[in-house]
Amino acid sequence: MLSITLSEVLNQMNLKMPSDEGVLNFELTGFSSLDQAGPHDVSFWTGDKVSETGLAGNAGGVSASAFAYVHAGLLFVPSLYEKYCIDGRSELLPNVRFVCPVENPYHAMVTFMREFVERRETFDGPRIASSAQVHASAVVEGVVGENAVIGPNCVVMKGAVIGAGTVLEANVTVYPRVTIGEDCVFQAGVVVGPRGFGFYEFEGKRRMVPHLAGVRIGNRCSFSANDVVAAGFISPTVIGDDCHFDTFVQIAHNCVLGNNIFFASQSGVAGSVTVEDDVEFAGGVQSAGHLTIGKGVKVAAKAGVTKSLKAGKVYAGYPAEEIDVWRRSVVKLRMMGKK
């Protein structure tokens, strides 16, 4: 858990200090995305870099009225919004303790994560329940619950939590900031919580995004051999209850999966995809990032999802479309090919 003051952050990042010294000792204890941030969290908003809408109007998918519900301890915003801020406060963001205009809010957030999370965050020492079974070759630095089984050559890093009755079979790696629920099964080679594949541009250079928000997995989930679940940036990658994944499945950073989801072998989702309850992916299905897969959707094998899918439908093909439309298209193409 973090415990830092606003003064420490502003000093370390060479940011403008407020004239109100009383706010400098305000405690910051976490970080999160704008929609989930709490009163002591650090977050950011990129705004509209072209015009001065956004805080004063509508930009970046956020309306002015929505900002009334934003809670944060420290919020990085674009420097062009400095005119709306007086000594770290803004009437447009009444529930944000300190609004901090910066040149590049995304880079500021990355800098904060590297300086205060990656380098300073501490975790409690290992704690293994008396009923847990841990193989002699395993390395456990995190928390292991009652009746859990940690198999040969598994690694449970500091800050990881393994729930009661969960089984890591062999060569499973669980990174820091990962919480796994009860009665889950992880086959050989599964990796949970590594840095995702994310980059951003700043000052003419492409830079890596630190994914330090970890992963949260619910109860009764199963992961087959060599699956990978990447950590989120400032909000965790989330998988609900009763989800089951075949071999070689990839769940990218910042994805949010609901309950009762089934992915067959070699399927996967790119970053920031929302998968609602009861979704099924057949083998080899791949989804582009920043989409929503609606409740109860089924996607046929080898399909490529390039846009959000409506709930309750069956899809196929590339780009994925409703399966009846896809079938008619395939028939027409075959008929044209015979002429």
Show which residues each predicted segment covers:
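Structural signal for interior beta-strand "rungs" in well-ordered beta-sheet cores
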Residues: 44, 127-322
